[in-house]
Amino acid sequence: MTGRFITVEGTEGVGKSTNLAFIEGFLRSRAIDVITTREPGGTPLAEELRELLLAKREEPVDACAELLMVFAARAQHLNQLVAPALARGQWVLCDRFTDATYAYQGAGRGLSLETISKLEFLVQGSLQPDITVWLDIDVRLGLERARARADLDRFEEEDVSFFERVRAGYRARAEEAPARFCRINAGQPLAQVQTDIQRALEAFL
């Protein structure tokens, strides 16, 4: 039996880490064997690529180089962790996936969506998440939350206009795949956010 693939998406400061833990706990309470992972990352090599991708540096990072690092990490992650787990019948819960690439590198950086689509097919074929929980929030509120943390990565230091484009990119993805996307208002109190997430997951199950 093939497992199910759940992804959690959103811009900075939406509370992904907290809500990923909530989703994992909810699934385990239903006796579901779930692996929680993240992108970029999830395997030793993919985590090394993540560090390269997020590190602040004096040298400007070319947008195309950024895109290729994302997909290099994804190829390793999919082939070494995600696909084998799904084949064993385990569920995979992933912090970000290809929707983030369309949002950040496509809408945010202005790279060709056609190019991203070609790389997507090369790396993952027809594999798509079964459900995507999109934690959506006003960009300024999200950045205020994110920047309350001391150590910001290269992406978290981008300006508001970048994240407005990213949010619009997520909105476009949700409009293209409404059956897969579940938008959650992440600007609400946490208890309400998690009530909404649980309701969406119960409908999915």
UniProtKB/Swiss-Prot annotation:
It catalyses: dTMP + ATP = dTDP + ADP. The gene is tmk. Pfam families: Thymidylate_kin. Keywords: ATP-binding, Kinase, Nucleotide biosynthesis, Nucleotide-binding, Transferase. Transmembrane segments: none annotated. CDD domains: TMPK. The keyword Glycoprotein does not apply. Belongs to the thymidylate kinase family. GO terms for cellular component: cytosol. This is Thymidylate kinase. The keyword Cell membrane does not apply. One of its GO terms (biological process) is dUDP biosynthetic process. Gene3D superfamilies: P-loop containing nucleotide triphosphate hydrolases.
